């Protein structure tokens, strides 16, 4: 690439769908694709995003294109699958509003009656497809590789033979968050014959919670992992975070807790939790202590208000609805997806038709994650509490027990917590659990130590420990844990406290590339001792190598992470 690289790479782009599940695929073949040393980078979409999300295109996809590789994205069966029930319309793969050939169009029994009782409602593919797409993520990645190889052979044909096959093409997977989960699942399912390397950043990987043999050791303690699923700890968070906010100590950098001032009704949530016998004293301090005991460390407290404000109840809801294969008409836990009041003035989150934002605009605003924001202070579409004491509205504004006493929808949060024990949900969860057998594929897992969304203690750390049992000394897994990094990217309001985890994803990809193309020795598993930028929010100093310390090929012995026979040692 030229030193004057402007982000524009010429080439060919091809869109396709896997028809039965309407999984979106996007293939990019750069003009300087190396036909003599062919490579394909598969990028399963981050979280619940669609094909054209900025981070995958600008970070993971760009990495592949800059290395002269073809890049193939897949939306994991999620994508921009939003369907307007009232107007019978949704989106095609290229973003057009239509009534047919949609990314998602559910069958709704007694549709007219449902619309009458539930106006301005929407169906979401991840929530309402009834397919539990996560159980098929590995297959979708294999499909994306097959698609890429087929198109490469079509574009660069040689009479009588296929020039590009799994045998002669370097095949890599680079994913983040749920895309990282998909990457690991693909390695487990497909094996070394078709996948040569994986980088997984902040995977929401889930093991069998009944496995009680795995050990975590630090400099000061040895304990067994108490494994919890994502739906377990995220429903726990959804219960207690709104109550805990007033007990959070301000950041030592600027005496401030981002977004804490938005929580005006925390004590109401605490009171309702006490009434439900979920708190003894009904104080924010008690709620925060519960979160600490469940896996959130005190050093991550300052992220919790922001995390809940933008993730809210929807984060656990999407997994539970998918695992349980709930129909849109079931309105699980009396929640549904609706358009809401978009005007920020005197906003109370009521169900309203789309007005300021039109449905065609949703394609550009929506990443398959709710809420869809109309502006900084109001949503266009969100999960709503149907049984609010006054009328259906966003759970952020919901009074579930006493009229006009906002408690952030406590009743719905309690119901959702109970749903994790629903047999149909447990069966769906079982379908997506991981084996940790990577079949000797060279793999990096990169995880932010301060990640409040994908808790390392319930995801990557036990996964590495289990892999040490399954593969033993033949394992090619490297684990990189980064201090002062989360699922966030180090921008305002966390520019002074958190660093961009994606820097380390790219660094891991460079090490993997060097090993697979030049036999460079891979680094050992390690903790990266970073340093926050400091200063005030919005005015943090420029990042330096003191802040973003690169992965070391030969880390200091005090930074080594070791895994052996079901145990993992983290040097803290």
Question: What is the role of each PLM region?
Answer:
Residues 1-572:
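C-terminal His-loop and adjacent cap/lid subdomain of alpha/beta-hydrolase
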